[in-house]
Amino acid sequence: GRGRPAGGPLSAAGAVAAGPMLAHKAGAEGIAAAESIAGEPAALDHRAIPAAVFTDPEIGTVGMTEAEAEAAGYDPIVGEMPMRASGRALTFGESDGFVRLVGDRGTGTLLGAQIVAPEASELIAEVGLGIELGATIEDVADTIHTHPTLSEATMEAAENALEQAIHTLNR
């Protein structure tokens, strides 16, 4: 992993480690470095580290975009849910934005997400967890979400990728 000398313990975190300069990334790297130095198993999947921009609407991202997935040799499958189709977003009067999920068409593996929506900084964590656990687009589509909530848009984007959406036109 990043910050790990060949065959040695993970020993770099935060500003001296590669990748984006995010406080939550530095904290996770620090914990992994301490565990590694102590001889404990330490793993950190950098693909599952989310980022957020606190604008209006917020922006959340984790993992790969469709273009990054293509460049990495995947055959991407993409699903999108516009927030204007979200009942909860409509009740907030904040229906600008979308949830977009990216997966691998061959395996269904969840590769990333981009969210532009109210509370995107909160919503993106579900996809980070999915990436960390090796979830598929189908796993996300099959996860029952409370109605009406903003997080339903993640499930609906997965359903859209699988051409099973009921609140949007399928891709």
Question: Where on the chain are the PLM-derived regions?
Answer:
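FAD-site-proximal beta/loop scaffold in flavoenzymes
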Residues: 1-36, 122, 130
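Structured loop/turn residues at beta-strand edges in well-structured enzyme cores
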Residues: 5-8, 47, 135
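Histidine (H) residue identity feature
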Residues: 9, 24, 46, 145-147, ...
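Short beta-turn/strand-loop junction motif enriched in small, turn-promoting residues
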Residues: 18, 46-47, 86
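Internal hydrophobic alpha-helix adjacent to the cofactor/substrate pocket in enzyme cavities
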Residues: 24-48, 74-75, 133
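Flexible, glycine-rich terminal cap/loop adjacent to redox cofactors
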Residues: 38, 54-171
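Helix-loop-beta segment of a Rossmann-like dinucleotide-binding subdomain
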Residues: 49-53
